[in-house]
Amino acid sequence: MAATAQYLPRNNSLPSNPLMHPDSDRMHQGTTYREVQKMMHQEYLQGLATNAGHHMSLTPHQWLPNPASDWGSGSHLGVQAEHAKSGVQSNREDLSSGFHHHRSHLVHQQSPSSHAWAQSGGHHLAPMSPSSNSHQPLIYSQSSYTNLNGMLGPQASSLHHSMRDPLHDDPGVHDTQVDSPPQHLGHHQDHSDEDAPSSDDLEQFAKQFKQRRIKLGFTQADVGLALGTLYGNVFSQTTICRFEALQLSFKNMCKLKPLLNKWLEETDSTTGSPTNLDKIAAQGRKRKKRTSIEVGVKGALENHFLKCPKPSAHEITSLADSLQLEKEVVRVWFCNRRQKEKRMTPAGVPHPPMEDVYSQAETPPLHHTLQTSVQ
């Protein structure tokens, strides 16, 4: 009969006849259910007496009715149910204080999620009598209503929220404190966005910086080393080149822009004093100008190269003095000439002497000799 009571209709249009079993052969009065109810109360009282002082460890029966539920006061149970109710009234009064105290402790010991489930179940199984109290009629196990969340309506969701409110002292203040950090972060983010330059500003600055750098006569490597000497951040020539070409990330462009701007201001302020300008230029790796060698001087170097492809330091010095060139220029020219000779000679072919190669200038080319033999 307890399982049948779960599926009773929710309206109050039931007849006043005693509760009948659905089978037509066996007709039972409503007092049978009330007798079972009385037995369940007596068993629960015996359990409380046996475990005196430890009633918190007990859990009420799954289908144990609440003393204030509608199953005891409903008019649809009939007149005989009223007489049975008066018979167990004394036991229920003794049970009322301990049972309510035990149930309140169980509710507070539950987690917020299980607490919310209990109230959600009470919302769907609403009392059938308008004179019922706010307590739920029956205490159900949570495993029977695992899919109840999708069935809840707007009223149930508001009830679900209201049952979580007692867990907080001030829900309004709590919600404000939770929502305030994102607003603070958003304000801080807006402030940082205002300070950061836009992409158009970076593009314009990169263009102006390149023009000013070329006008002042500094290379990209000079700027990178000068930044390391002045501000402690050494940048390579590739980094400065990528900045001017707008190939760095936006974050790195924003970091490098103020340093380059300070370097430009420092350079512009020292334009009138050559000593300071030379000092800044000396901090970087100064690139020498490309040396232009005249045709007569180049021929003299070629003749010396045919005699000695790898001259000694003394020979380089004497040759530089005779040609009125710097010693470093003559040394670099011989290095480049030897590399050129290696590129011209195929790999695996023995390298002939320089005199033999250039002494055969009057002989016909090799391809001409091959064509003559074929004919």
Swiss-Prot record:
It is found in: Nucleus. This is POU domain, class 3, transcription factor 1-A. Residues 194-268 form the POU-specific domain. SUPFAM superfamilies: Homeodomain-like, lambda repressor-like DNA-binding domains. Acts as a transcription factor. May play a role in neuronal differentiation. It comes from Xenopus laevis. The lineage of its organism: Eukaryota, Metazoa, Chordata, Craniata, Vertebrata. Keywords: Developmental protein, DNA-binding, Homeobox, Neurogenesis, Nucleus, Transcription, Transcription regulation. SMART domains: HOX, POU. Residues 107-117, 129-138, 151-160 have a biased composition (Polar residues). The gene is pou3f1-a. Residues 286-345 bind DNA. GO terms for biological process: brain development; regulation of transcription by RNA polymerase II. The keyword Transcription regulation applies. GO terms for molecular function: DNA-binding transcription factor activity, RNA polymerase II-specific; RNA polymerase II cis-regulatory region sequence-specific DNA binding. Belongs to the POU transcription factor family. Class-3 subfamily.
